[in-house]
Amino acid sequence: AARSIPVVPYGAGSGVCGGVLPTTDTVLIDMKMMRQLRHIDRARLTCDADAGMIGQHLEDDLNAAGFTLGHFPSSIYCSTLGGWIAGRSAGQCSGRYGKIEDMVLGMTVVDGTGRVLRAERGGENAALLPLFIGSEGILGVVTDARLRIAPAPPCRRFASYLFPSTETGLDAIRRIFQAGLR
């Protein structure tokens, strides 16, 4: 911080906005070794995971324990939890489980001065959560997060439908959501 040297966290490198393109005086932090699912709290339906964990690996580990995060961005195979948080990501099942900002209950961040901050929803430093979620890593490096999880569904079925017009397709989506179907 004293030398104004940029620090850029590097998760899986799937971002398309150029956020991980360092200049010659940049410190690049490779997050790949921070890739563990640390804890599942079955009673509270939460899990603690490292920010460098690839999304599909997180989902696979949760599924093996009977749970799901329910977050399925198109980049799930090549993006990290920290990247999802930094990018404020949404996924294909956001209508059912919410976006990443709805799932993050707490996180640890190292800010630009090197301070380690813990923010918990409804607790200490809660006001920091909306600042860091979607900040693209500008304000600090997310190191881990506590996430809301759900019991894994007994089965998943996917289908596609063709509608005669955009309007009828949008009307069908509206009726599905109003009926509470997800």
Where are these regions (language model features)?
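Glycine-rich N-terminal segment of FAD-binding domains in flavoprotein oxidoreductases
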Residues: 1-34
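FAD-binding subdomain of flavoenzyme oxidoreductases
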Residues: 36-182
